[in-house]
Amino acid sequence: MKVTFKDVTMSYDGKKDTLKDLNFTIPDGTLVSLLGPSGGGKTTTLNLISGLLAPTAGQIFFGDTDVTKKDALARKVGMVFQNYSLYPHLSVLDNIAFPLKMAKVGKAERHAKAKDLAKLVHVEDQLDKKTGALSGGQQQRVAIARALAKSPSLLLLDEPLSNLDARLRIEMREEIRRIQRETGVTTIFVTHDQDEALHISDNIMVLANGSIQQFSSPQTLYDQPNNLFVAKFIGEPVINTIPAQALSADLANAVPEAILKQAVTAGIRSEAIIPYDAGENVLAKFHGKITHSSKYGREATADIDYNGERLLSTEMAGVSSRQPELDFYITKSGFFLFDQSGALIFGGESHAE
């Protein structure tokens, strides 16, 4: 099911807009993550999609149908919350089958459907157990199966991995991706964890301060951020940011003068600072002093002093710790310039111009 927002605004108190003029389309059959800091509008957006909230203004469409005034029951979406909300007195089988029981589906039919879903989420060997006897990952699988019981056109997941340990989070994000692909259901996944979003999503919507900062594929977010917020929010380690003026002399032959005059902040990915000449991929060269270096396994990093600014490079393999000063090169990929408003004015696709 395709989901479309047209000029959607949401205000809880009638004074301050939690969401302002949201316009987007989520294609049918895709997995989209809503990513951003706390208070950015992720859960509010999800609740508007589900029908738990009604927008202050604007329209919401499922396919070509206007569902703006339809409640959650009428929209027929499946939801999985952070706490799973399973029924502890019921077996796994009856938890999965519960929505079908409420819909007056016969026992044999609902149990057959529940068993099929249990196989899909890999809990078919746990059907007779109470949910309290399950691990966190198993409980989440049951919650997803229950959400799929009525064959929803949309599956909504609100921070579903936050209660799991690091190993289980990795395992379960891959399972969610597998389940989504096998069912083909349009899935919307809310998270504040960029690693989850980058690994699981077809597309990511970055939300902050109630507005969409960028809505694109994970790779595009990283390679072509719309603005400084996205550049800093996406990527690990966090992108190096320094005043553009500190680089102006070394960029004079690589960046048009008109752009340099507008540039306020330079963003440089740590892998875009290299200690060797990469030929045509090089944008600029500078001389820097290594103030600290670290090597662990295949990872070699260095803190570099450049005109009084600190830069981190993660491409220092093969560089001797006895070389405190040397020439560094900035690659075209991973370098960006932003203006006073934070908008991207150079970098990403602009290198091809």
Kindly label every feature range from the protein language model.
Residues S50:
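Helix-to-loop junction immediately C-terminal to a conserved catalytic motif
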Residues A72-G78, Q82, L86-N227:
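ABC ATPase nucleotide-binding domains
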Residues M1-F5, T9-D21, K69-D71, K104:
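A short, flexible loop at the N-terminus of ABC-type nucleotide-binding domains that lies
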Residues L35-P37:
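The feature captures the beta-strand-to-loop junction immediately N-terminal to the Walker
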Residues T43-L46, V142:
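ABC ATPase nucleotide-binding domain helices that frame the ATP-binding cleft
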Residues P237, A249-E353:
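Non-catalytic connector elements of ABC transporters
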Residues G58-D66:
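Conserved ABC transporter NBD signature motif
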